[in-house]
């Protein structure tokens, strides 16, 4: 519909009622202007759900008047839906425009795309998903079919680009397998060695993270099911190869499960023979959003943007019915009804998330006692009260409850995922807390689990002991909070805790956990530099620098490995510069930062370091530590838009500042700092 102007426009607009249809017609009649934006917002106020194409149109209107951050937010809301590849084509120009203008990104990174098939339709989708995930990405697209040349040519475009992350796009045709391979083990070993050589070259050249796909399967097999059982059968060889890829991949290489993506899309939609023959397009265009989403889940994990908390509603989400109206016998969960079984399957999935370290929380409009009743007395509930790190059941709005929950858990809201059957509640949380990931689950309980899983919100590249113990740690933290409340002062509380600290070298044993902290810690993080495992290890191995990891415990249990501090040597031999100083927010207010400072000064005295330079690089999340160096006795020596620099003259005799933490490093057998 063409827009109109002047008296004719006014006449049209004056005739339109203030209804959903009237508001939509206004959006079609108005040209780009603030009035058009207001018309879109009025239209959205009538809607329980929002169509991605309407959100895209509103985003364009906002961008046209220079409201780029607001435009990006509307586009992010559109991209949070399950959109088809045609949507990305419509949004492409706007995505690239906003990518260069928005400043609300959480991370910046350089991503290289190297493919054996055509990637020019894939890259715009990746760019859009980066915008959705608040990643300021500069993307380099290698030439078609030139993976080897890009990796091994010292003068290639990749070498000039110097990526942080390299995405490799390969598929079953690259294996050049016949229906049957004579010696499958020899062939697999040779192929793996070629991949490992490429990985080493990339790692040595760029210190980057590599995202390598496992291999998908041909849509047609002449041998049928025999291809998976015969020695050397193509399906069997691909199965074994994919297993070896996962086993052989080093820490800085993650393997994308292409077989899972192929299953998600469906083999018949995954491949388009005509598109391959004509354009060397693989997978098919309609499969590209799912294909790109699989890779982006790894990017988020590498950058520390995976979600940590699943917050769920109760009525018609964890069970069928309303507990306050239907009572314990009236709600449905478990055997007895299809809906009840669907809710039980969702609970079991959530319980598995909890076992792998994801925190579970409840946010429900309910009376507190009613909300707890099914967890205490219903025989078929898979989840129990002990499985939740936070439980909020009241009549306050859910956005306010989520904010309070974030404060209580000491976690930022961009680590939250929100699950609710009520579309109005979902829209309210989206509008008030855009950083929270809201699952667009629909209204049928048979879709809840699938939609939650498809979001890949909790993707992780490794599973550490600290992850598995996370839920227990938060339960113990509740006991500490109770002790704090009963203590007459902070000193009294810290004394009762009986805190102990340990300092240890960064080795292959703890490298994964240290790297995880480097890429996930936001609040107590002086520089917020993000490094690969290889980079962290290289810093730790510098004989002229100093890098240590820190553990903490008290009378109630261990906090685990919760901090890292590393210094780089400066040109002159008696000067260190603090490269990274970070600490888990779970230990705030326990003097752990002072314990780390004390160990740093001890090491500096031992190494005859005269001065230590501290650097504070402000971000949207680390304002907590903006005055930290001042508090620790450093003096300000310089300031720019990007950072503030401090210096400390190392005292001849160290003074203990962490008076409430006992250093048990020696008794634990760790290396002297």
Language-model segments: which ranges?
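Serine-esterase "nucleophile elbow" of acetyl-processing enzymes
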Residues: 82-142
């Amino acid at each position: 519909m063409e827009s109109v102007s002047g008296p004719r426009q006014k006449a049209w607009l004056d005739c339109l009622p203030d209804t959903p249809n009237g508001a939509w017609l206004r959006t079609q009649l108005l040209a780009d202007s603030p009035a058009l934006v207001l018309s879109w917002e009025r239209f959205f106020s009538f809607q329980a759900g929002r169509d991605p194409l309407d959100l895209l149109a509103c985003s364009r209107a906002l961008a046209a008047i220079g409201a780029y951050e607001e435009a990006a937010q509307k586009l992010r809301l559109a991209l949070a839906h399950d959109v088809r590849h045609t949507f990305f084509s419509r949004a492409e120009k706007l995505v690239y425009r906003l990518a260069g203008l928005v400043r609300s990104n959480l991370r910046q990174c350089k991503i290289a795309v190297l493919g054996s098939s055509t990637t020019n339709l894939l890259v715009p989708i990746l760019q859009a998903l980066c915008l959705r995930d608040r990643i300021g990405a500069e993307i380099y697209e290698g030439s078609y079919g030139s993976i080897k040349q890009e990796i091994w040519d010292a003068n290639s475009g990749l070498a000039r680009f110097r990526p942080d992350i390299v995405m490799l796009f390969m598929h079953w045709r690259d294996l050049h397998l016949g229906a049957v391979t004579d010696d499958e083990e020899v062939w697999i070993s040779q192929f793996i060695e070629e991949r490992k050589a490429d990985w080493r070259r990339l790692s040595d050249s760029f210190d980057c993270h590599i995202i390598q796909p496992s291999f998908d399967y041909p849509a047609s097999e002449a041998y049928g099911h025999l291809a998976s059982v015969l020695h050397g059968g193509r399906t069997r060889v691909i199965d074994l190869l994919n297993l070896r890829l996962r086993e052989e991949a080093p820490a800085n290489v993650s393997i994308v499960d292409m077989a899972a993506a192929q299953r998600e899309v469906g083999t018949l939609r995954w491949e388009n023979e005509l598109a391959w023959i004509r354009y060397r397009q693989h997978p098919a265009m309609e499969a590209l959003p799912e294909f790109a989403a699989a890779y982006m889940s790894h990017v988020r994990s590498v950058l520390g943007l995976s979600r940590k908390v699943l917050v769920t509603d109760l009525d018609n989400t964890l069970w069928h019915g309303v507990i306050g109206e239907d009572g314990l016998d009236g709600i449905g969960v478990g055997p007895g009804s299809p809906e009840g079984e669907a809710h039980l399957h969702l609970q079991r999935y959530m319980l598995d998330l909890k076992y792998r370290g994801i925190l579970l929380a409840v946010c429900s409009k309910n009376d507190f006692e009613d909300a707890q009743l099914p967890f205490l007395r219903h025989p078929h509930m898979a989840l129990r009260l002990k499985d939740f790190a936070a439980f909020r059941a009241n009549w306050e709005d859910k956005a306010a409850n989520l904010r309070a929950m974030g404060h209580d858990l000491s976690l930022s809201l961009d680590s939250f995922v929100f699950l609710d059957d009520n579309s109005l509640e979902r829209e309210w949380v989206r509008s008030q807390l855009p950083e929270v990931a809201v699952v667009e689950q629909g209204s049928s309980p048979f879709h809840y689990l699938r939609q939650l899983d498809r979001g890949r919100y909790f993707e992780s590249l490794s599973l550490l002991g600290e992850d598995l113990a996370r839920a227990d740690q938060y339960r113990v933290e509740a006991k500490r909070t109770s002790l704090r409340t009963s203590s007459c002062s902070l000193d009294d509380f810290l004394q009762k805790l009986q805190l102990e600290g340990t300092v240890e070298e960064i080795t292959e044993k703890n490298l994964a956990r240290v790297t995880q902290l480097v890429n996930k810690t936001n609040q107590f993080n002086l520089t917020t530099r993000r490094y690969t495992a290889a980079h962290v290890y290289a810093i730790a191995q510098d004989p002229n620098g100093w890098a240590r990891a820190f553990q903490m415990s008290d009378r109630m249990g261990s906090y685990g490995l919760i901090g890292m501090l590393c210094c780089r040597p400066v040109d002159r031999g008696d000067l260190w510069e603090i490269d990274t100083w970070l600490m888990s927010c779970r230990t705030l207010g326990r003097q752990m930062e002072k314990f780390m400072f004390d160990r740093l000064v001890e090491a500096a005295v031992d190494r005859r370091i005269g001065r230590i330079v501290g650097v504070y690089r402000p971000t949207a999340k680390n304002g907590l530590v903006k005055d930290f160096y001042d508090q620790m006795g450093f003096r300000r020596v310089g300031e720019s838009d990007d950072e503030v620099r401090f210096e400390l003259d190392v005292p001849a005799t160290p003074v203990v500042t962490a008076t409430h933490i006992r250093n048990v490093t020696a008794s634990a057998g760790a290396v002297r700092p």
